[in-house]
Amino acid sequence: NGRQDPGEPGAAGVRVIVGAFTSLTDSTGRYHVWDIPAFERVLVQIDSTSLDNPLYVPAFTTASVQPPPNAYRRLDLPLVTGAVLEGRVVQEGAPVSNVTLVLTNTSSGKQTSLATFGDGTFYVLGVKPGRYTLEVDPRDLAARRLVGQTLVFTAEPGRPDQLSNLVLEVRAAAR
């Protein structure tokens, strides 16, 4: 849920990047970085390649902090369980290969592009909780003279397998 609940363990061995410095979390999920210049903004982020579970994703990409002088500042970096998004693109039941799909988080507007495989299937690991749309890239539709549907769905926290077997249908455009 993006918050450490009582009794929930911290994530150990996660690389945290603080400006030009890095630190690994200890067995409780805590990390420490020293000698950060006071009053200067610094970006803090989790190196997602250091997470031991590929479904864990940082709740936010980066945090910008401005540390005070001679003081300790706590900054929690929450992880959430992402979903697996998988399905196929079809035209009259036949797979549509090598098309670009656009996954859009409707809250943030952030877009992610992905391509279908040769058999028309697609797969994305670690989709953050939220409301999304998925559609074939309009440029691909225009180039192939197709029209397509837009899927609207919600990725819910803690349910990684909820977005399986999605079917995105396209059809020939009217002339």
For each predicted feature, which ranges?
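Conserved "repeat-terminator" motif of extracellular CCP/Sushi domains
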Residues: 68-83, 165-175
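Beta-strand-rich structural segments
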Residues: 46, 81-91
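Structural motif
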Residues: 1-11, 87-99
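Hydrophobic beta-strand segments
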Residues: 14-16, 99-105, 134
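Structured interaction patches on ligand/partner-binding surfaces of diverse proteins
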Residues: 50-73, 139-165
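Short, acidic Ser/Thr/Gly-rich low-complexity loop/linker segments typical of extracellular
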Residues: 4-6, 10, 17-30, 106-121
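Surface-exposed coil/turn segments at beta-strand junctions on protein surfaces, enriched
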Residues: 24-26, 37, 68-70, 78-82, ...
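Short Pro-Gly-centered beta-turn/loop motif in secreted/extracellular proteins
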Residues: 11, 32-43, 47-50, 119-141
